[in-house]
């Protein structure tokens, strides 16, 4: 057997053990502390579960603030007091890293998001059968999306509508949420009859009884999501421990449960 093949096999056996040891070391330092996390609104349910798991493992309290990635980016440039930033667009963390605001070598692409058209179960048009045509139906007077000026999921929605060739036809129907969670709330509350929202929200307990149609990933730029530890993090050890936890198999399984994909899969499929 070739030496190269043996070395590769040994590497894949050793790597999980190395990560486990590294995570254990960070978690030991994190015990009993508190971290402040700025998270994109598409993570509302997934991050809630991850935070609870981490708290049980380490005793570290995770205080999460949800919002739009673009707004957090502006706040962090002006010294907002967060330890970690989980963005729905990796370009924001990259810019923070380039500006020297991030802890060196902590930038991590943790997931790739997906978008769907979502309607309440009682909607007059069945989105699972009609897809894009749902948005053109006269029963749909308002379509909720996140504000594309500062929300990555809003930009993805606009790009997909343009790719589908219906943006001009539905532009007058669009209503903007401050972030993707607020856009979803507009549809849930009846203030819009349909919405283009994050799959991670559509599969949550609050929305899973509605109907959804997954927008093909090739119809919009990939929602590459990135995280990092801030250079001025008050509890850096705990922040690093949380970031390492997110890389674990347990955390990735939780993200997958909420519809998130991972960079290695999308690259393999040529969707990058």
Where are these regions (language model features)?
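Secretory targeting signals
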Residues: 1-5, 19-21
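Bacterial N-terminal signal peptides
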Residues: 13-24
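Exported/periplasmic ABC-transporter solute-binding proteins
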Residues: 29-66, 70-80, 87-90, 94-103, ...
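N-terminal export leaders
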Residues: 6-12
């Amino acid at each position: 057997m070739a030496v190269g093949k043996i070395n590769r096999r040994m590497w894949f056996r050793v790597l999980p053990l190395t990560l486990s040891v590294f995570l254990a070391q960070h978690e030991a330092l994190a015990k009993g502390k508190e971290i402040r996390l700025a998270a994109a609104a598409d993570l509302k349910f997934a991050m809630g579960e991850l935070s609870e798991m981490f708290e049980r493992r380490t005793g570290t309290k995770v205080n999460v603030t949800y919002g739009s990635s673009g707004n957090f980016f502006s706040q962090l440039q002006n010294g907002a007091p967060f330890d970690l930033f989980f963005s729905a667009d990796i370009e924001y963390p990259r810019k923070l890293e380039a500006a020297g605001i991030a802890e060196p070598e902590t930038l991590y692409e943790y997931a790739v998001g997906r978008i769907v058209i979502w309607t309440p179960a009682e909607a007059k048009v069945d989105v699972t059968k009609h897809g894009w045509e749902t948005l053109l139906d006269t029963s749909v007077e308002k379509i909720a999306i996140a504000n594309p000026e500062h929300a990555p999921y809003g930009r993805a929605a606009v790009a997909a509508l343009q790719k589908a060739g219906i943006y001009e036809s539905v532009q007058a129907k669009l209503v903007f949420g401050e972030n993707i969670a607020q856009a979803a709330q507009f549809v849930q509350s009846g203030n819009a009859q349909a919405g283009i929202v994050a799959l991670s929200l559509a599969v949550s307990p609050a929305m899973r009884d509605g109907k959804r149609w997954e927008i093909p990933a090739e119809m919009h730029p990939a929602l590459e999501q990135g995280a990092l530890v801030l250079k001025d993090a008050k509890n850096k050890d705990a922040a690093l421990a949380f970031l390492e936890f997110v890389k674990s198999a347990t955390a990735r399984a939780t993200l997958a449960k909420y519809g998130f994909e991972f960079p290695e899969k999308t690259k393999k499929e040529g969707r990058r």
